[in-house]
Amino acid sequence: MKRNINLFKCGGDKMYVVVVYDISLDEKGSRNWRKIFGICKRYLHHIQNSVFEGELSEVDIQRLKYEVSKYIRDDLDSFIIFKSRNERWMEKEMLGLQEDKTDNFL
C-alpha cells in the first residue's frame, strides 16, 4: 500500500499581504534599511517608499519575518504585516517598536 504523507506543507493557500516598515536611519539603521528593502523586494512588489504588497503563502510569510527579524531593533524600528484572506478583513502584525497612533485613550 502506497501512502502519500505530507510532513511539511510547502506553500498552501496564498493571502494578500501589505508590508510597511519604519527604520531609524542612524549609522546602523541605514544599512539595516537597505537589507530589509532587499529582503522585501524578493518576496513582494515595491509600491511606495517602505511599502510592499503581494500574495504570499503562510510559509513565505514566516520566512520573510525570520529574515527581517535579524535587522529589526525592537527599541527603534517597526515592521508591520497586514494579511488578508478576504478583501474585507486584514490582520495586523507588528515587529519591533509598536507605536499605535490610534491607541491614545487613557
Curated annotation (Swiss-Prot):
Gene3D superfamilies in the record: 3.30.70.240
GO biological process per UniProt: defense response to virus; maintenance of CRISPR repeat elements
GO molecular function, one term: RNA endonuclease activity
Enzyme Commission code(s) on record: 3.1.-.-
Record InterPro entries: CRISPR_associated_Cas2, Virulence_VapD/CRISPR_Cas2
Listed Pfam families: CRISPR_Cas2
Highest taxon of the lineage: Bacteria
Amino-acid positions noted as binding Mg(2+) in the UniProt annotation, renumbered to this chain: 22
EC top class named in words: hydrolase
CDD domains assigned to the protein according to its UniProt record, in alphabetical order: Cas2_I_II_III
Cofactor(s), by name: Mg(2+)
Keyword tRNA processing: no
SUPFAM superfamilies on file: TTP0101/SSO1404-like (SSF143430)
Keyword Coiled coil attached: no
Function: CRISPR (clustered regularly interspaced short palindromic repeat), is an adaptive immune system that provides protection against mobile genetic elements (viruses, transposable elements and conjugative plasmids). CRISPR clusters contain sequences complementary to antecedent mobile elements and target invading nucleic acids. CRISPR clusters are transcribed and processed into CRISPR RNA (crRNA). Functions as a ssRNA-specific endoribonuclease. Involved in the integration of spacer DNA into the CRISPR cassette.
Homology family: Belongs to the CRISPR-associated endoribonuclease Cas2 protein family.
Subunit field text: Homodimer, forms a heterotetramer with a Cas1 homodimer.
Record protein name field: CRISPR-associated endoribonuclease Cas2
Source species of the chain: Fusobacterium nucleatum subsp. nucleatum (strain ATCC 25586 / DSM 15643 / BCRC 10681 / CIP 101130 / JCM 8532 / KCTC 2640 / LMG 13131 / VPI 4355)
